[in-house]
Amino acid sequence: MSFDIAKYPTLALVDSTQELRLLPKESLPKLCDELRRYLLDSVSRSSGHFASGLGTVELTVALHYVYNTPFDQLIWDVGHQAYPHKILTGRRDKIGTIRQKGGLHPFPWRGESEYDVLSVGHSSTSISAGIGIAVAAEKEGKDRRTVCVIGDGAITAGMAFEAMNHAGDIRPDMLVILNDNEMSISENVGALNNHLAQLLSGKLYSSLREGGKKVFSGVPPIKELLKRTEEHIKGMVVPGTLFEELGFNYIGPVDGHDVMGLISTLKNMRDLKGPQFLHIMTKKGRGYEPAEKDPITFHAVPKFDPSSGCLPKSSGGLPGYSKIFGDWLCETAAKDSKLMAITPAMREGSGMVEFSRKFPDRYFDVAIAEQHAVTFAAGLAIGGYKPVVAIYSTFLQRAYDQVIHDVAIQKLPVMFAIDRAGIVGADGQTHQGAFDLSYLRCIPDMVIMTPSDENECRQMLLTGYHYNDGPTAVRYPRGNAQGVALTPLEKLPIGKGLVKRHGEKLAILNFGTLMPEAAKVAEALNATLVDMRFVKPLDDTLILEMAAQHDALVTLEENAIMGGAGSGVNEVLMAHRKPVPVLNIGLPDFFIPQGTQEEARAELGLDAAGIEAKIKAWLA
């Protein structure tokens, strides 16, 4: 998509923040309007995260107008809202390539631009990193400002509060901006509150505030009276007591779509000392009515026609694995009142919408709090219930200690339904589910299952749900199922694989949903094909049998080779002193960039042609 100068005449003048700061302030509302329209035009043609960026246009313009970026350092949390930032920082003409192979990264990325101070993708990291960056800037002595932008979802995570607690203790010079994009502008946002925010953020108020503290510090009753008076005055118009108690000077809430007001407030706050907190209210999906009405649906979008006001409907093909899980969850809950389902803010993505509506008293969305989700599940299990934690592979990493300390050591029957396992695609390095088999396999008493299709996935979910001797995990990929027939639910024998095809000389031991590719390769090479099903416990007997009957073995998985299922097979063979050659095929030792799942598998040699080529080269 080429940039249309006639359509966006003001935006055409801005290809860097230096050019932005040369614009007269009066032209900035027009720039915001063009930037929002350009974002709509670009993302609707290319796909990507959408509603969040529409809500941060004015904030982004104001930040880059007031602060001397990239010298001053701007940190975006998660990064869904950073598309306008990318457009204003030299990447305007490439925004149509975002999330595509070889295109712009879906999130702020240090290797892509000097304006991207912190590489992100997971939530709630900005304030912690910002404190470190602010401390480094102070020691550097170059008067460099630090600003963190965090959303109302990300700030609910414990890590954000840990960071703010630390900031209140060491008091670095930094600004945290809370982008609060609830469904409506707060009743406190208006002319009076914006005017008050500018007064409270000014140097005069700050000087009087700090000077008063020093003068009356030796007179405890008066000091306490002043504190209470200030809190009372602020409390009449702002909800900032919590952040004040953490040691921040709180300002807000203010209208996040008033670019001129934001500029005034930011200029006032730019030179204040110590940790500052600015609370802004924005509208997710701002400027595009369908996204304003349904920001969840328009959070991330495929290519669509903006004039239609709706996203393209599914082709009605095969259900996704998330839907398979959601259907199983509802079916099981209808039979067993002990089932409790937990998700860390991933209801839609994990296929739990129907469950949340049918069983609201047994559905728990704990927000972006993976650690809490796991230990909460442990408590439910102790109380005699049957918790199912639905979580993406990449986010389960954030609760690793809780899986070990709070669940596995106590042998609690918590089942982890691990979605987005393996290659995820367009969200790139931060979201690939590359490591779960490796980091779970080493945990004692953990049962790990890898279904080869949707029917086996259902059976494994049932098996894990009814396993009472410790935690279980069923991992399945992003994307559509394979269209196999669904059979009645029945428990599988723990730790037992299944031979799918008998061949000669070579045996392929497959773990998971690469089975269709493995079947093609087995047919081409006349190899034995085994659906291993369990990563832990491994079917040692079957592995040794395959080793005895074949000249070589190949393991296949969509997980990191290091420490994965193939490593487990190697360990079994070494423990029994079996000198059979083994080729481990899986994800290589680097972080996999964005692109479609098909592109990534082809490039990594995990499609049928690539797997066959790897095996032939190894056997040659």
Curated annotation (Swiss-Prot):
InterPro entries: Dxylulose-5-P_synthase, THDP-binding, Transketo_C/PFOR_II, Transketolase-like_Pyr-bd, Transketolase_BS, Transketolase_C, Transketolase_CS. Thiamine diphosphate binds at H80, G121, H122, S123, G153, A154, N181, Y288, E370. Keywords: Isoprene biosynthesis, Magnesium, Metal-binding, Thiamine biosynthesis, Thiamine pyrophosphate, Transferase. Binds 1 Mg(2+) ion per subunit. Its cofactor is Mg(2+); thiamine diphosphate. Signal peptide: none annotated. GO terms for cellular component: cytosol. It is an enzyme of class 2 (transferase). GO terms for molecular function: 1-deoxy-D-xylulose-5-phosphate synthase activity; magnesium ion binding; thiamine pyrophosphate binding. Its EC number is 2.2.1.7. Mg(2+) binds at D152, N181. One of its GO terms (biological process) is isopentenyl diphosphate biosynthetic process, methylerythritol 4-phosphate pathway. CDD domains: TPP_DXS, TPP_PYR_DXS_TK_like. SUPFAM superfamilies: Thiamin diphosphate-binding fold (THDP-binding) (SSF52518), TK C-terminal domain-like (SSF52922). Pathway: Metabolic intermediate biosynthesis; 1-deoxy-D-xylulose 5-phosphate biosynthesis; 1-deoxy-D-xylulose 5-phosphate from D-glyceraldehyde 3-phosphate and pyruvate: step 1/1. It comes from the Bacteria. Homodimer. Belongs to the transketolase family. DXPS subfamily. Catalyzes the acyloin condensation reaction between C atoms 2 and 3 of pyruvate and glyceraldehyde 3-phosphate to yield 1-deoxy-D-xylulose-5-phosphate (DXP). This is 1-deoxy-D-xylulose-5-phosphate synthase.
